[in-house]
Amino acid sequence: LHKAIRRQRQMCIRDRIKASADFILKQSKYKPEIGLILGSGLGSLADAIEDAEYYNYADIPNFPTSTVEGHAGRLVIGKLGNKQVVAMQGRFHYYEGYSLDKVTFPVRVMKLLGVSKLIVTNAAGAVNESFNAGDLMLITDHINFSGSNPLFGHNIDEFGPRFPDMSEAYNLELRNKVLEAAKELEIKLQQGVYVMFSGPTYETPAEVRFARIMGGDAVGMSTVPEVIVANHSGIKTVGISCLTNMAAGILNQPLHLPLIHISE
């Protein structure tokens, strides 16, 4: 009985995802191939999308809504360069009280919209002492210290396998393209491992030391669930952190106030 209930719940999740995607597909003239998830203070990138369509999260059936300052709460679909894209201007966080299937809900909607590549951004605290506030970091891998995983429970076979491979969670080909673009544009780009904590408290100095010992270069409260679900769904993913501050214990400074300003 318990298994039957879990299976029914997963079917309901699948149906809710499809309803959200169908709502957009019926109205949009685009079939986006690239998804963008824009983190704290980074949503202004969506303003560069041309001939854009806007879908407020509150208007999309079954979509959660963001409660975080600096997150607009809408999908922007249009053209960026010569590519059709869909951008999340504002993401959902585990610490807001959402289950991880809701945090990652938009990624699966993107999959049904036709997205095959995903670019994820976030604001993060630097753990690596050779980094500086304001640096950009290309994510090479992640460590999940959130205490949970969005794939817990019955697998939704329509999206991916029960045990997805995470050996290249951040696609090497896409990472190399980002490195090439940064070099051409003369943008300093660090590389490192992103460590997710659940939040909403910032990490303690002891937790930051632990993250550093375990091989982390930056810490934050997002990204990992979306990347896991994207990989499960067969979406190639690349991630970039804007290092808005040095993590706790590295410098003696307050943490949240400069995030949006530095990101912009």
Language-model regions, residue ranges each:
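Metabolite-binding pocket within alpha/beta catalytic cores that recognizes anionic/polar moieties
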Residues: 10, 14-166
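Residue-level detector of anion-binding/catalytic polar loops
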Residues: 84, 116-117, 188, 217, ...
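His/Asp/Glu-rich mid-to-C-terminal helical/loop segments that flank catalytic regions of hydrolases
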Residues: 248-263
